[in-house]
């Protein structure tokens, strides 16, 4: 598994997940 791809995906999911949790 590529570290760059994983960190990029993790960053994207965390950025999308945080606002959703705050709104919920």
From Swiss-Prot:
Pfam families: Humanin
Cytoplasm listed as a keyword: yes
Effect of residue 8 to A: Abolishes neuroprotective activity. Formation of short irregularly shaped fibers with BAX with fibers showing non-uniform diameters. Formation of thin irregularly kinked fibers with BID
Record note on what altering residue 12 to A does: Abolishes neuroprotective activity
Segments of this protein annotated with the region Sufficient to interact with BID and BIM and to suppress BID and BIM activity: 1-12
Region Required for secretion, residue ranges: 9-11, 19-20
Record note on what altering residue 20 to R does: Abolishes secretion
GO CC list: cytoplasm; extracellular region; extracellular space; mitochondrion; nucleus; perinuclear region of cytoplasm; sperm flagellum; sperm midpiece
Region Sufficient for neuroprotective activity: start-end pairs: 3-19
Family, as annotated: Belongs to the humanin family.
Function: Plays a role as a neuroprotective factor. Protects against neuronal cell death induced by multiple different familial Alzheimer disease genes and amyloid-beta proteins in Alzheimer disease. Mediates its neuroprotective effect by interacting with a receptor complex composed of IL6ST/GP130, IL27RA/WSX1 and CNTFR. Also acts as a ligand for G-protein coupled receptors FPR2/FPRL1 and FPR3/FPRL2. Inhibits amyloid-beta protein 40 fibril formation. Also inhibits amyloid-beta protein 42 fibril formation.
Protein name: Humanin
Organism from which the protein derives: Homo sapiens
Protein encoded by which gene: MT-RNR2
């Amino acid at each position: 598994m590529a570290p760059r791809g994983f960190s990029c995906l993790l960053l994207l999911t965390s950025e999308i997940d945080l606002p959703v949790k705050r709104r919920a």
